[in-house]
Swiss-Prot record:
It comes from Chlamydomonas reinhardtii (Chlamydomonas smithii). It is found in: Cytoplasm. InterPro entries: Gln_synt_N, Gln_synt_N_sf, Gln_synth/guanido_kin_cat_dom, Gln_synth_cat_dom, Gln_synth_gly_rich_site, Gln_synth_N_conserv_site, Glutamine_Synthetase. Residues 135-382 form the GS catalytic domain. The keyword Transmembrane does not apply. One of its GO terms (biological process) is glutamine biosynthetic process. Its EC number is 6.3.1.2. It comes from the Eukaryota. GO terms for cellular component: cytoplasm. One of its GO terms (molecular function) is glutamine synthetase activity. This is Glutamine synthetase cytosolic isozyme. Belongs to the glutamine synthetase family. SUPFAM superfamilies: Glutamine synthetase, N-terminal domain, Glutamine synthetase/guanido kinase. Homooctamer.
Length: 382
């Protein structure tokens, strides 16, 4: 199935891209002198909590840390994050990445969002107040409290590529289904490894940007892929995961395909998409007591199972059915090397008496700030 055409005005799959990207590539490759200035692409989470927004500004100096960057604002009424009569939302830079699209000294900036600054009676500025969709703020507070425990994370981000016109998985027969699952996971070859170009370009661009991406593989559902981000410590997990998604959206824009983070994109006897979250602390990584600490963590996670499930991704009930390598949504379980459990512990952890474990409950549309905050709260702070 062709993936070449996209756009609100396109109705025929054979229509080419509305914009000729070869022209864009020509000029971007030949025009390299920016007269000592750089482009900074400010990136933030939009009002749906799934979309990622961005806009650019020109800087005269190259920042070395987020604090060197100016705060900015945007029209929150156009992103579902503010009313029209008081529409300004403020952006505070938090993490800097290289811009793999523009190259050179240009940068991508992960930001979080705040209400406009308020002035105290004494004329000083009050501390910025996060808007409701700013989940990074609470996560940063929790990670600061737990930093002595050195929480490490690695998230497995599954996604499905869709034809931008039909909204059907890339490479699937129009209005039909491919052969059953089996030949697609970690596959190679035409007809089974569908969408590798997208996965490979995304992989390389994340590396170039400085996103701590650690691997890529084709998944069980045809046109479904996974990439892994981590290990990342504390708040950096959320920053790197959200920037990796921004880069994915940009790559799919270039290929005129859509990416879906829906946890069950195709109903029926097909695998869903997860955001399995691997986790360890200094205590779990230290033998011989690490294995005991992991078991204590599992007991704590069981006690707050309902709290975690409620925040682990919209539509997750369609995925967590106890089938297709998932646990039951209503029941907590953990086990060694068991992919049908809520928590999977690696085979060597009981042997080595230390290590990490995998929370398999989060959906592919997870908010990494929310999931990592909850895990640390439950296992360390409560």
């Amino acid at each position: 199935m062709a993936a070449g055409s996209v756009g609100v005005f396109a109705t025929d799959e054979k229509i080419g891209s509305l914009l000729d990207q070869s022209i864009t590539r020509h000029f971007l490759s030949t025009v390299t002198d920016q007269q000592g200035k750089i482009c900074a692409e400010y990136v933030w989470i939009g009002g749906s909590m799934h979309d990622v927004r961005s806009k650019s500004r020109t800087l005269s100096t190259i920042p070395t840390k987020p604090e060197d960057l100016p705060h900015w604002n945007y029209d929150g009424s156009s992103t579902g994050q503010a009313p029209g009569h008081d529409s300004e939302v403020y952006l505070i830079p938090r993490s800097i990445f290289k811009d793999p699209f523009r190259g050179g000294d240009n940068i991508l900036v992960m930001c979080d969002c705040y209400e406009p600054p308020k002035v105290n009676p004494d004329g000083t500025l009050a501390a910025p107040k996060p808007i409701p969709t700013n989940t990074r703020f609470a996560c940063a507070e929790v990670m600061e409290k737990a930093k002595k425990e050195e929480p490490w994370f690695g998230i497995e981000q599954e996604y499905t590529l869709l034809n931008a016109i039909t909204k059907w998985p890339l490479g699937w027969p129009k209005g039909g289904y491919p052969a059953p699952q089996g030949p697609y996971y970690c596959s190679a070859g035409a007809g089974v490894a569908i969408g590798r170009d997208v996965a490979e370009v995304h992989y390389r661009l994340c590396l170039a940007a400085g996103v701590n991406i650690s691997g890529v593989n084709a998944e069980v559902l045809p046109s479904q892929w996974e990439y892994q981000v981590g290990p990342c410590e504390g708040i950096t997990m959320g920053d790197h995961m959200w920037m990796s998604r921004y880069i994915m959206y940009r790559v799919c824009e270039m290929f005129n395909v859509e990416v879906s983070f829906d946890p069950k994109p195709i109903p029926g006897d097909w695998n869903g998409s997860g955001g399995h979250t691997n986790y360890s602390t200094k205590a779990t990584r230290t033998a011989p007591d690490g294995w005991k600490v992991i078991q204590e963590h599992c007991a704590k996670l069981e006690a707050r199972h309902a709290v975690h499930i409620a925040a682990y991704g919209e539509g997750n009930e369609r995925r967590l059915t106890g089938k297709h390598e998932t646990s039951s949504m209503s029941d907590f379980s953990w086990g060694v090397a068991n992919r049908g459990c809520s928590i999977r512990v690696g085979r060597m952890v009981p042997v080595e008496k230390s290590g990490y474990y995998e929370d398999r409950r989060p959906a592919s549309n997870l908010d990494a700030y929310v999931v990592t905050r909850l895990i640390v709260e439950t296992t360390i702070l409560l």
